[in-house]
Amino acid sequence: MGARKKEQAAVGRVGGEYRASRNGSSSRVRLEENRTSEDQAILERRAELLSKSGINSEYLSAASLLSKEPALEVGGECGAAFLPDDCQLDAFRTVAFIEKGNKCFASKGRYAEYFNNPAISLIRSEDGVVEGIQTVENVLYCKQALVVAAGAWTGSLMQSLSIKPDAVPCVPVKPRKGHLLVLENFNRIHLNHGLMEVGYLGHKAAKSPSDVDDDLLSISMTATMDMVGNLVLGSSRQFVGFNREVDESIIRCILDRAGEFFPAIRALSRNINQIRIGHRPYMPDGKPVIAPVPGLPKVLLAAGHEGSGLCMALGTAEMVGDMILNNPGKVNRTPFLMQGRFV
């Protein structure tokens, strides 16, 4: 998600430092909380499935949950799925770390950055094979492949790059706007783990914008402490195109929802230090596209990861690299192909 300049400036100060926390006193393991018997059944089943898959997971009773997170208001039917091996990434530091690694290849002619230089069209050979891309200022040739990984803009970019838009397969990735609230140096509560309500999982898989009102809003509680002690609250999801305006009513909804879980937040003023706005690349079936583009030799897509792009970035890059080099895949690629998924 995008951030205000104050947060962006912090990236420069940390340079390429990468941080992920887990376990011990600074752990940010995940708790998925339920408040109804229906949610309890969902999380108990989820914890069981994760355990069977080899992921450390257990279901916590209300008493066990309260012992781990005293700041929570825990009712009789409350409980949580506890994932003690989960990690929390600092998005800004992680991106800076990856970027620093990429720049090491610049001196070898294997990496370059082009900002404010939009792509205009694909460059094709006489037999239709894509050979490169034309930007406003440059012609960039590709030897083995061209990978389009433009997040929520991927679908519209693919259409704009083709001389005959109807010849390009439709990529139904949609922007799904979200707000995150950052409360700097917030000391009224202390969190020992990253927290989310079980409804967050359902909201993430909400219906396509073609099936619902464009401005349908879903709010589910998420709460984490970042590396410098700020409380980060979320989260909202809505289909409103690429609108980037801060919506004060959504801020109120996020705070009100968080207040249902944390009494200390209920009396909080609306003066939030930072508000992050961004667009998740939503796919109707909940899976990203990581695949060659039918009818466009040498072109691959990597898009539609919704809110999991950062966590899945390195795995996606490995999959794409294996496709380009014709290496055997380490995972089943079929669910991520384009064929048969979109009408």
Residue ranges and their predicted role:
Residues 38, 71-77, 123-131, 141, ...:
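A short, glycine/Asx- and small/polar-enriched loop/turn
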Residues 61, 115-118, 274:
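Short loop/edge segments at beta-strand edges and connector loops
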Residues 80-145, 149:
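Helical element adjacent to the flavin cofactor pocket in flavoenzyme catalytic cores
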Residues 150-151, 303:
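Glycine-rich, N-terminal phosphate-binding loop of Rossmann-like dinucleotide-binding domains
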